Amino acid sequence: MNMAVFLDRAGRSVGGRPVITVGEKTHSTCAELAGRVARIAGRIRDRLGLAPGERLALVMKNCPEFIEVLYAAWHAGLCAVPINAKLHPREIAFILDNSGSRCCVATPDLMEAVGPLVDDVPGLERVVS
């Protein structure tokens, strides 16, 4: 059992409860998050071609989307590789190379630094936002 199963159960049992808040504002309820996670997991499998057990790197700032992509990776049966967004691109490249990640998800503001790493990391096939 993985963490995405707990989110799916919470989405069904306490779906209307807030699960992500940003300041005073509710960003997502349990049911909304569970639905988004399932959709993102499907896109990860279909568009990125990742199969269960493969690694997906996440170079993202602290935002609700990080939680969505992290849970989507677990939902898809992937091994999530969260990488500190404050690291230097050389350090990120080192982690990407050593983790065996084929794909990386980055927040849009980090694409300029992370996107070009696809040319420097042999096993990395793509970086998406």
Report residues per predicted region.
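Conserved donor sugar-nucleotide recognition element shared by glycan-biosynthetic enzymes
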Residues: M3
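Generic signature of intrinsically disordered, low-complexity, basic-rich segments
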Residues: F6-L7, D97
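Conserved AMP-binding/adenylate-forming core of the ANL superfamily
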Residues: D8, G16-C63, I67, Y71, ...
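Structural core segment of the AMP-binding/adenylate-forming
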Residues: H75-S129
